[in-house]
Amino acid sequence: MSKVTIITGGTSGIGRGIAEKILENSASDDILYVSYGHNTEQAEEFLHAQTEENQKKIRLLQADMSSYDEMMKFVSRVKEEASHVDWLINNVGISTYAKYEDYTFNEWTKIVNTNLSVPVFLVKELRPIMSEGGSILFTGSYAGQQAYSSSLVYGVTKSAIHFLTKSLVKELEPKQIRVNAIAPGFIETSWHKNRTPESYERINRKIALHRFGEISEVADMAYEVLKNGYMNGSVVDIHGGYD
């Protein structure tokens, strides 16, 4: 039977790295559902960057994962086509550099919905078709363990994701579904493209390895966590020794 994997936000950044790692290790009849938001051009670029063989495995589905209704449409589409899901990667996430006093309620709500509420209900809706012994992975963040004033709401949601990871272990025990999370630190993604050299230097001084992590390094670890048969309820840091 083919392996069916779902990844949200899989056309850019860490999500893309994880998606490509899965494709790299996939069998010819495996299927990978990849959700993307409003950037159709980016999604198409991701698709066409893959080998012809891997393109056939990809199912690109547009869905605004800050919206419960959009998420439900995504789930309905998956259930129409797939009889089971083996791996689920809740990766999509958004943030803001706004200060606490500048947040609006709508901004706060959108980030909470995207990073926490919708992933909670995505697991709930897909649970009935998750395979026995399946694997769920959340992309958390070291910001969920270390407070940063510039990303308060993001950190709050990621801290909640870490707790959710541990809480779901017992919920999904009857089907022996493993639930884990990764908690990346500062990783070289487009999110940091506007940082000044001074900002990079200041952060690198706090990292024992004196550099930002690479997407491929996070993807490698995510893949190992997904397939490890005895990891369950773990939140795995990957931050280069940030302190």
Q: Could you describe each region identified by the protein language model?
A:
Residues K99-Y100, T104-V112, H192, S199, ...:
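Substrate-binding pocket helix/loop in short-chain dehydrogenase/reductase
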Residues A27-E44:
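Conserved glycine-rich Rossmann-like NAD(P)H-binding loop of the short-chain dehydrogenase/reductase
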Residues T11-S12:
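Conserved glycine-rich cofactor-binding loop
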Residues P128, V169-P174:
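Alpha-helical segment proximal to the catalytic Tyr-Lys
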Residues I129, R211-I238:
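C-terminal substrate-recognition "lid" of short-chain dehydrogenase/reductases
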Residues V123, T157, T165:
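Active-site helix of classical SDR
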